[in-house]
Amino acid sequence: MNQKLRCVLVMTLLGLSPLAEAHSPIKDIGEFYNGLLHPLLVPSHLVSILVLGLLAGQQGLPAMRPAMAGFCLALLLGLAAGVGIDESAAQWLLLMAATGLSVMLAFAIRLPLWLVWIPCMLVGFVLGLDSLPESTGWQRVLLTLLGSWLGAVLMLLCVMIFSEAMTRPWQRVAIRIAGAWIGASALLVLSLALASRTA
């Protein structure tokens, strides 16, 4: 990974850090688009979807189908559950999952097909529980939830396709390096969260 790419990654992470509590809606763009952008604006959601998509794509096309199906179903169940969980608890769960998945990604661990859908369902369900909108009124809530589901699914699909398309040896190495950086970033955020709780 060259120096420019490292700088871009660091600046991106620093830019995302103020958005750690970005569950509040953006004004004047509507409920659907707020939901659509939600996975991009919450760092723990963004990191977990990125590493999940990279890992699933690394496993190859046969693994992507159960991964996508498991994620879509679990995300839908989480959104439909209608019971939010504490934001800090969700952040911890997602970042710990991202850390574990990033280790598998960095070491290019091959997962059996029957095992691929388990981390996808875990991440999808927690994302769904942590994506409950602040809107009132069932129509607004429904639009926000629909946007959240579609945004997360499209983001995961794009990352999976990108990762699966990286077939050259140097590209596979770059994916593994990205996994290591994502894991390091997740650990950094976890460390900061732990430090803030103990301070």
Q: At which residue positions do the language-model features occur?
A:
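Membrane metalloprotein/metal-transporter helix-bundle signature
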Residues: 2-10, 17-199
